């Protein structure tokens, strides 16, 4: 009977050791899940950032060309006249907006202009 008790206690000890290893394994996998989720969030952030950088780089060529054109015009003007020459102002025009959005922006700008002029009148009185 003592041998069977010893065998049973040995099996119980093995099961407890296995249980402890499984608990440790579960803790490690939970930590791994948290780290992978964190990496996933960081990758999403990086993805948004790379999209912004790609957009900037896609427009960079046209920006450099615009600056170059303005500089060339300035050089030609300075060669023709002895007056002090200033570069031509560069204006950004949105091409991808719908007419409705343009009208909304114009109305908002007009309202802001009216408010600004009213504030000026009040301050002068």
Curated annotation (Swiss-Prot):
It comes from the Eukaryota. Residues 79-125 are annotated as: Disordered. Residues 101-125 have a biased composition (Acidic residues). One of its GO terms (biological process) is filamentous growth. Disruption phenotype: Cell cycle arrest in mitosis either with unseparated DNA or with unequally segregated chromosomes. Abnormal spindle morphology. Inviable. Keywords: Cell cycle, Cell division, Centromere, Chromosome, Chromosome partition, Cytoplasm, Cytoskeleton, Kinetochore, Microtubule, Mitosis, Nucleus. It is found in: Nucleus; Cytoplasm, Cytoskeleton, Spindle; Chromosome, Centromere, Kinetochore. Transmembrane segments: none annotated. Belongs to the DASH complex DAD2 family. Component of the DASH complex that connects microtubules with kinetochores and couples microtubule depolymerisation to chromosome movement; it is involved in retrieving kinetochores to the spindle poles before their re-orientation on the spindle in early mitosis and allows microtubule depolymerization to pull chromosomes apart and resist detachment during anaphase. This is DASH complex subunit DAD2. It comes from Candida albicans (strain SC5314 / ATCC MYA-2876). The gene is DAD2.
């Amino acid at each position: 009977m003592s041998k069977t008790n010893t065998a049973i206690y040995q099996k119980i000890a093995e099961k407890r050791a296995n249980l402890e290893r499984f608990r440790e394994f579960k803790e490690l996998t939970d930590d791994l899940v948290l780290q992978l989720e964190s990496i996933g969030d960081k990758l999403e952030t990086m993805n948004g950032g790379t999209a912004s950088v790609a957009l900037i780089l896609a427009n960079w060529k046209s920006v450099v060309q615009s600056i170059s054109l303005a500089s060339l015009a300035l050089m030609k003007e300075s060669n023709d006249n002895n007056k002090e020459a200033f570069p031509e102002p560069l204006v950004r025009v949105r091409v991808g907006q719908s007419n409705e959005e343009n009208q909304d922006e114009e109305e908002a700008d007009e309202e802001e202009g009216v408010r600004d002029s009213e504030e000026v009148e009040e301050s002068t009185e």
